[in-house]
Amino acid sequence: SSAASDVYKRQVLGKAYNPLYGWYVSSKHALEGWSDVLRLEVKQFGIDVVIIEPGMIKTNIGNYSAQYFEKYSKNSEYKNFYGSPDDSNENTFDDYSDPIVIAKVIDKAINAKNPKTRYSAGAYSWILLTMRGILPDKWFDRLIVNVTG
């Protein structure tokens, strides 16, 4: 059992990505690299660094972002990525996981005697990470573009 654990929520978007979320995805890539290095640096002190990889979780970030996408992209070449103003956003989160799913995984990681390096949980996390790992980049790009816009 380690003396302590540092747990970081990274989001699947650190490995998978969506158009118009470059600002968010880049921060998750940075957290991924930093966590990997930190894990090596603090292991000697008995500290485990654990990364939580949430899938699609019911939060307000999508609605919040959509306001800005529409405002700043509606007359640009990028408008096809956020949809038309008539597109309904009501059912977007129906199949997303509740945040409690991630809280339970964090609890599991903190209380594990020998925690895994990474835990994934939530809607689409497993499938996105698996697809990202097995598909060539251009195929995955095409999949993302077909799904998002």
Regions found by a protein language model. Give the residues of each.
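Active-site helix of classical SDR
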Residues: 27-30
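Core catalytic loop region at the nicotinamide-binding pocket of NAD(P)H-dependent oxidoreductases
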Residues: 49, 87-133
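C-terminal beta-strand-loop-alpha-helix "lid" module of Rossmann-like NAD(P)-dependent dehydrogenases
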Residues: 44-93
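Active-site loop immediately N-terminal to the catalytic Tyr-X3-Lys motif
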Residues: 16-23
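Non-catalytic terminal and boundary segments that flank Rossmann-like NAD(P)-dependent oxidoreductase
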Residues: 138-149
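Active-site segment of SDR-like NAD(P)-dependent oxidoreductases
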Residues: 10-16, 55-56
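Active-site-adjacent segment of SDR/Rossmann-fold oxidoreductases
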Residues: 16, 37-47
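Short, small-residue-biased leader/transition segments that mark boundaries at the very start
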Residues: 1-8
